[in-house]
């Protein structure tokens, strides 16, 4: 009889809102950025690359001042792929600094695999991209898909 009473007491304790609380899942993911911007770089030109990076940092700083976040992706394709190549990037140190200072906003650099494979065939060797570079199948498809998801598009 004692076991039945004890079990009934436990049942009441765990189902009563006054004694037990439901555990809520802990969200370990950072919140989704409030703004999203993709910037295309398709020229092997230091000025164009610097302009794209300036656009990215200006947007990040602007929204930081408003206590808001932004996701920025710089997508390099065609001759612009040199921006993300370890051996030819004229802006690799600046990219590293931007990556380190973007938080809580996010910045991603993506490279068109179609362009990368064509350059590898032409040069007869594999190409190494900057650390953290995301390889996408086709740059134009990446731009299309991000815009379909509501990302704003800029081409310097």
Where are these regions (language model features)?
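Acidic helix-start/capping segments at beta-turn-to-alpha-helix junctions
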Residues: 70-84, 115
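Short, glycine-rich nucleotide/cofactor-binding loops
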Residues: 41-53, 86
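Histidine-anchored nucleotide/phosphate-binding helix
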Residues: 50-65
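Boundary at the C-terminal end of the N-terminal hydrophobic targeting segment
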Residues: 18-20
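Bacterial N-terminal signal peptides
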Residues: 7-16
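A cross-taxonomic marker for long C-terminal extensions/tails that follow the last structured domain
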Residues: 85-156
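Acidic/histidine-rich, surface-exposed loop or edge segments in extracytoplasmic proteins
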Residues: 31-44, 75-79
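Positively charged n-region of N-terminal signal peptides that target proteins for export
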Residues: 1-4
């Amino acid at each position: 009889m004692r076991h039945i009473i004890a079990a009934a007491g436990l049942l009441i304790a765990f189902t009563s809102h006054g004694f037990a609380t439901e555990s809520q899942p802990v969200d370990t993911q950072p919140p989704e950025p409030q703004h999203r911007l993709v910037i295309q770089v398709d020229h092997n030109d230091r000025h164009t690359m610097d302009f794209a990076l300036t656009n990215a940092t200006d947007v990040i700083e602007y929204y930081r001042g408003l206590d808001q976040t932004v996701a920025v992706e710089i997508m390099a394709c065609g001759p612009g792929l040199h921006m993300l190549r370890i051996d030819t990037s004229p802006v690799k140190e600046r990219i590293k600094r931007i990556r380190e200072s973007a938080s809580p906003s996010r910045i991603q650099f993506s490279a068109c695999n179609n362009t990368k494979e064509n350059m590898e065939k032409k040069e007869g060797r594999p190409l190494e991209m900057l650390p953290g570079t995301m390889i996408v199948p086709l740059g134009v498809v990446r731009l299309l898909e991000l815009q379909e998801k509501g990302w704003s598009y800029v081409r310097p």
